[in-house]
Regions:
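Short, acidic/polar
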Residues: 28-39, 104-118, 158, 162, ...
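Residues at the N-termini of beta-strands
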Residues: 15, 46, 123-126, 176, ...
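Active-site gating/metal-coordination segments in enzymes
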Residues: 94-128, 209
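Beta/alpha (TIM)-barrel catalytic core signal, keyed to glycine-rich beta->alpha loops juxtaposed to Asp/Glu
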Residues: 25, 132-338
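Active-site mouth loops of central-metabolism enzymes
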Residues: 20-30, 94-106, 148-156
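N-terminal binding-site loop/beta-alpha segment at the start of enzyme catalytic domains
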Residues: 1-87, 106-109, 122, 170
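Surface-exposed, active-site-proximal loop segments in enzymatic domains
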Residues: 57-60, 90-103, 135-147
């Protein structure tokens, strides 16, 4: 396993980050424990979770994923060997059971304390804002959000948010901060406040979707990463499992995410399916696993710090982790780019 420095910090993180979103709903606590045991043994030292998890959300399951991690940490005593990232939920209709205030100093402080309790730790290495509380494009929204902009009641409180996060860092409860599901404008607003007042914490990472089916990060945010030293933590690198190839041919595997939750169709449109078929042909031609090829491609990008992989079975997890040793040939990369030119970003 290779390691990278988490941007602007002294933390070394594995190139693969263990995703946890299904623990507590699709996966039991024992299955989560098994995944953590295996990941740790493979040298993965970076785990990502959120107060919102598991997803799809249910009020009665709020925070259960963090609790599973906390129980494992208590059992194994390996907290100091790990880099733990979690997130505060934004304001949305599906988070009313968590809070309705968005990102406020009081809400942030309370959310951190609750996450610490569930994780059974006294510090969080990377604390992230899960999505913007303003109206903009994220979670698969596309095109110009004219009506959303017109009805947006958001008041710019980014200075206030950074000030509170700075206090939390000073207290030792969190170490570094990141954003998620953000736009170039949003990231630069946080950077602007830090540059205006250096005592405010600087954003270290952005956790956004990035995969062969969604390379929008390259259009605007990659330059922000390059010029401002912000690392990308790609999530959904296999597009809800679509790039595993298991849905090809119209298949609906029992227990698979899109089978269980048909509304999760972001990566399953007709053009995305054609692109997936084309990527699958490349993998077959070169004797590669489609998911391993898809994950290895992301590591070729200099702005990627660590790729978040989630799995509902040990078989999936092992195959994904094994991608860490795969180096793609120039021929494979060229073929991938050719497909991308034909089907650019079919699942934004």
């Amino acid at each position: 396993m290779k390691y990278n420095t988490l941007n602007g910090t002294d933390l070394e993180v594995s190139e693969i980050c263990l995703g946890t979103m299904t623990w507590g709903r699709q996966n039991s606590e024992n299955e989560g424990f098994e995944q953590m045991d295996y990941a740790f043994d493979q040298g993965i030292n970076f785990w990502d979770t959120a107060e919102l998890y598991p997803v799809p959300t249910l009020p009665e399951l709020y925070g259960d994923t963090e609790k599973i991690i906390g129980n494992w940490l208590t059992k194994n005593g390996k907290r100091d060997e790990l880099v733990i990232a979690t997130k505060i939920a934004g304001k949305a209709p599906f988070t009313k059971h968590i809070r309705t205030t968005g990102f406020t100093p009081k809400g942030i402080a309370e959310a951190i304390d609750l996450s610490l309790q569930r994780l059974k730790t006294d510090y969080i290495d990377l604390y992230q804002l899960h999505w913007p509380t303003r109206n903009t494009n994220f979670f698969g929204k596309r095109d110009y959000p004219d009506e959303a902009f017109k009805t947006d009641e958001w008041k710019d409180n980014i200075y206030e948010v950074l000030s509170e996060l700075g206090k939390q860092i000073a207290s030792g409860k969190i170490r570094h901060i990141g954003l998620s599901n953000e736009t170039p404008w949003g990231v630069m607003r946080f950077i602007e406040e830090h540059k205006r007042e250096a005592s405010l914490p600087k954003i270290a990472t952005v956790q956004n979707p990035y995969s062969l089916l969604n390379r929008l990060y390259e259009i605007g945010l990659s330059e922000v990463s390059h010029r401002e030293n912000i690392g990308l933590l790609p999530y959904s690198p296999l597009g809800f499992g679509v790039l595993s190839g298991k849905y090809l041919g119209g298949k609906s595997p029992e227990g698979a995410r899109v089978t269980l939750f048909p509304n999760y169709s972001r990566y399953s449109g007709p053009i995305a399916t054609k692109a997936t078929e084309a990527y699958h042909e490349i993998a077959q031609k070169h004797g590669l696993s489609l998911p391993q090829m898809s994950l290895a491609y992301l590591r070729t990008k200099p702005f990627v710090t660590s790729t978040i992989i989630g799995a509902t079975s040990m078989e999936q997890l092992k195959e994904n982790v094994e991608s860490a040793s795969l180096v793609l040939s120039e021929e494979v990369i060229a073929a991938i780019e050719e497909v991308h030119n034909t089907y650019p970003n079919p699942a934004p």
